Amino acid sequence: MYGSARSVGKVEPSSQSPGRSPRLPRSPRLGHRRTNSTGGSSGSSVGGGSGKTLSMENIQSLNAAYATSGPMYLSDHENVGSETPKSTMTLGRSGGRLPYGVRMTAMGSSPNIASSGVASDTIAFGEHHLPPVSMASTVPHSLRQARDNTIMDLQTQLKEVLRENDLLRKDVEVKESKLSSSMNSIKTFWSPELKKERALRKDEASKITIWKEQYRVVQEENQHMQMTIQALQDELRIQRDLNQLFQQDSSSRTGEPCVAELTEENFQRLHAEHERQAKELFLLRKTLEEMELRIETQKQTLNARDESIKKLLEMLQSKGLSAKATEEDHERTRRLAEAEMHVHHLESLLEQKEKENSMLREEMHRRFENAPDSAKTKALQTVIEMKDSKISSMERGLRDLEEEIQMLKSNGALSTEEREEEMKQMEVYRSHSKFMKNKVEQLKEELSSKEAQWEELKKKAAGLQAEIGQVKQELSRKDTELLALQTKLETLTNQFSDSKQHIEVLKESLTAKEQRAAILQTEVDALRLRLEEKETMLNKKTKQIQDMAEEKGTQAGEIHDLKDMLDVKERKVNVLQKKIENLQEQLRDKEKQMSSLKERVKSLQADTTNTDTALTTLEEALAEKERTIERLKEQRDRDEREKQEEIDNYKKDLKDLKEKVSLLQGDLSEKEASLLDLKEHASSLASSGLKKDSRLKTLEIALEQKKEECLKMESQLKKAHEAALEARASPEMSDRIQHLEREITRYKDESSKAQAEVDRLLEILKEVENEKNDKDKKIAELERQVKDQNKKVANLKHKEQVEKKKSAQMLEEARRREDNLNDSSQQLQDSLRKKDDRIEELEEALRESVQITAEREMVLAQEESARTNAEKQVEELLMAMEKVKQELESMKAKLSSTQQSLAEKETHLTNLRAERRKHLEEVLEMKQEALLAAISEKDANIALLELSSSKKKTQEEVAALKREKDRLVQQLKQQTQNRMKLMADNYEDDHFKSSHSNQTNHKPSPDQIIQPLLELDQNRSKLKLYIGHLTTLCHDRDPLILRGLTPPASYNLDDDQAAWENELQKMTRGQLQDELEKGERDNAELQEFANAILQQIADHCPDILEQVVNALEESS
């Protein structure tokens, strides 16, 4: 205080020796004990025996300085450069960090209220900084300007409120310093004015409480303003996200990276684009219908041509000629040509053989005319008979070939096996013809060699002439048959050429049909692609609808928050008005106090002349005090030396503890060695029994007990360390203790490792099941080791208890020494207090008179400044009120605009949902119509095939068509179920809308509940109508379809609509909620019943699904 030189910056401990110790209590009475001769604040301090006296002006200035700012010790500013957490505001000394270049001034001397004065320019926004505004590219200019304006207004309001806080804090601290400095003097020397001072003090205390409340209210307002700023930032962020969404949407459609603003033009553009897409979808649907009609007509023409092909090619028995069919046709024609060539070859062979036969017969006729009958003639006759038999076999082969040709023409193609058989027959015929030629040559040679004998055989050949005539007749008949066969072959070749031409014509027509079908298929694929694109567009629209709904919810929440903010700001305006009234009353009270203080200052100026004589006595008393302080310092040095000796003793104790820890580590190493022995024993073991398992369990229990004892030992060691830490204060001892703790943790790790190995060994021991005797011996050895370890643990416990007792004794001795030191220091302090009291009794009169005069002058100046400050505050509060009113009006305008935009978005949402439903219903209708057309086409094909003549293949085709028809019927059933689901989803969406509208309002009114009830009733009537259509269809077709299905109770109820609506108007909100739940249950039951009827229809008679679809259209 008097030695600290009133400086906060550089504080040197060397300049503290003549000054006051920081440990001494702060007293306002010792505010001007030691100072320099010039009244400065830093410089050379006056020594104990300087003998200089201070003038009255210096004393008054010193007292004024000490009264305004209070004493500042070195202990108060030892942590000037230390780091403190951000935004911690306490009602004590300021400990916050300030940026470079900002002065920090202490604003009061009270130990309870202090603050740091920060320049208003350094006050930042939120966490002492504003985020950089980097949304210029995404945020529109109007929104950016509005945001900047609001942020600037809020910053100015924050600065004004903080300035008010600083001024109020200064007033509070000044008042407290005045009260604390003037109360003691009034008690002793100014008894007539004691009552007045007490009244003033009470007034000041009440004003201080009022100011504190005002300060708290201003803090709350600051917090609320920060909350509003954050809300506005969130709103700006949401607006930016909306703009980015619209920008992305517009860039994906047009390819131009333009910035989309949320305006009515964007909504109109979106709506126009949506209408254009709907028109395109309608045109696409029309073209799809036209293409489907064209496809159906093409299918009918194709079916007609197929039927004609079937009629023309019944021999081929195939519906259509694909690429494989054309190849088969080529093979068939090739086989027919080969068969014709084979027939021509056989005919030529027959002609040659007939010529040879005729030649032979003529020769035989000539030679047998005169030849006698002998055995040779008989041989010749047998040869001729053999030739006749061969000719007949060849004729049979010809007939077989003709039959094969007819089979080829009827069946269309010869199989590979038949072809191989034909080749074999051809080879047989060729070999036979060669054999015959060889025989004829041999006969010629025999005839030439035996010409002499022919004459003898002529007589015998006369009898054979008749037979030869018969052979001739047979040969003529065979010639006629050959001519007939040739004519048949020519007709067959002509028919084959005609069929070839017809097949080529049919092929050309089929290729044309295939080309047209390919074109139609490409068109259908293109239409499907366009349908998929439209479905993706619909999905995008649904996503946009969901986003709009989310935006609607967020904007509704923002509207609610804005309403709350409006209410809060209105409350703030009321509070500010009350503040202004209170400040005006305070100004009046301050003016009255100023007048009374001026009168008292005039009366006190006469008492300032008697202060010079008391200064000399004060200086002598101060010199005596300095001597006593030096004695106390010497005693403190002695106490420190004694404490150092105690610390050395503790170090020795720590060494002993280290030795004990090393002993414990040796025990651990022994345990590890025993564990290694256990491992070796476990590897040598091979079997184990139940007795060994029980002994192992006992060993585990013993190990757990050891663990618990180790943990107890560690806890005891920790307690001993904590006791030693309490007794020690040097850094070396703390380092050694930390080293011991690390060793203890290492010991724990080693014990945990040992425990893990023990567990692994136990598992190995459980697997071993042989060699019981060896294991018993080793278990006994382990038990002995456990007993030894238990003994060691007990010894360690005993040693630890002895060490604990020693440490407790040492702590008690240290406490006794500290108590003795405290007693001696207390005695010295008592003697010092007595001397101080004596000195103070001499000083009181002079000091208090000087203080009172100086204080009165300062009070006058401060009251004037407080009055001007209060006037400024009143003006600033009025300006703030006007700004708050303007903000209220702007927020109201924003509310109205946001509500309008919300209404527009809701209408847009409902339109988009209705269009989506319509598109989905149209798509489902188109699919159902296409399926019905396909089913009818399959039915027509089945009827045509059943009317055809061939049986086997037509039955297979009918079965295939029926399978396709069943598949189409299943698809139709699936589509009807999808349509029913769509109706149910539409109903649920409507119900969700109504429930969501009810949820947005916190407590829905009865009128809001009646509307969804009426919608539920309409849906119920539609479901009843639909179920009625289905039941009539089932009764008309087959009543057994509805066997086992019972309609719900709600289906048979027929209520009067008008009476029911009148009853709804009379019901309360709870009754309406119950009625709503009942209606939902009834609709769910009716929906389930309708689904069950549809399932029965699909199972029993799927052919009436078309009538079901018509019933759906009527009900919808």
UniProtKB/Swiss-Prot annotation:
InterPro entries (UniProt xref): ELKS/CAST, FIP-RBD_C_sf, Rab-bd_FIP-RBD
Ribosomal protein among keywords: no
Superkingdom, taxonomy of origin: Eukaryota
GO CC entries: anchoring junction; centrosome; ciliary basal body; cytoplasm; Golgi membrane; IkappaB kinase complex; podosome; presynaptic active zone cytoplasmic component
Expressed in which tissues: Widely expressed. Isoform 2 and isoform 4 are abundantly expressed in brain. Isoform 1 and isoform 3 are predominantly expressed in testis and thyroid, and isoform 1 predominates in other tissues tested.
Residue list for modification Phosphoserine: S17, S21, S37, S55, S75, S94, S1005
Keywords: Acetylation, Cell junction, Cell membrane, Cell projection, Chromosomal rearrangement, Coiled coil, Cytoplasm, Cytoskeleton, Golgi apparatus, Membrane, Phosphoprotein, Protein transport, Synapse, Transport
Keyword Cell membrane: yes
Annotated site residue numbers, Breakpoint for translocation to form ERC1-RET oncogene: K719, A720
Phosphothreonine: residues bearing it: T38, T1046
Bias (Gly residues): 40-51
Gene3D superfamilies: 1.10.287.1490, 1.20.5.2440, 1.20.5.340
Localization terms from the record: Cytoplasm, Cytoskeleton, Microtubule organizing center, Centrosome; Cytoplasm; Membrane; Golgi apparatus membrane
Biased composition (Basic and acidic residues): 590-602
GO biological process, one term: positive regulation of NF-kappaB transcription factor activity
One Pfam family linked to the record: RBD-FIP
Chain positions found as N6-acetyllysine: K10
Record-annotated FIP-RBD domain positions: 1046-1108
Described function: Regulatory subunit of the IKK complex. Probably recruits IkappaBalpha/NFKBIA to the complex. May be involved in the organization of the cytomatrix at the nerve terminals active zone (CAZ) which regulates neurotransmitter release. May be involved in vesicle trafficking at the CAZ. May be involved in Rab-6 regulated endosomes to Golgi transport.
Assembly information from the UniProt record: Part of a complex with CHUK, IKBKB and IKBKG. Interacts with CHUK, IKBKB and IKBKG. The interaction with IKBKG is independent of CHUK and IKBKB. Interacts with NFKBIA. Isoform 4 interacts with PPFIA1, and through its C-terminus with the PDZ domains of RIMS1 and RIMS2. Interacts with ERC2/CAST1. Interacts with the GTB-bound forms of RAB6A isoform 1 and isoform 2 and with RAB6B. The interaction was strongest with RAB6B, followed by RAB6A isoform 2 and weakest with RAB6A isoform 1. Interacts with SDCCAG8.
PANTHER family given in the database record: ELKS/RAB6-INTERACTING/CAST PROTEIN, ELKS_RAB6-INTERACTING_CAST FAMILY MEMBER 1
Disease implication from the record: A chromosomal aberration involving ERC1/RAB6IP2 is found in papillary thyroid carcinomas (PTCs). Translocation t(10;12)(q11;p13) involving RET. In vitro, isoform 1, isoform 3 and isoform 5 participating in a ERC1-RET fusion protein activate tyrosine-protein kinase activity.
Protein name: ELKS/Rab6-interacting/CAST family member 1
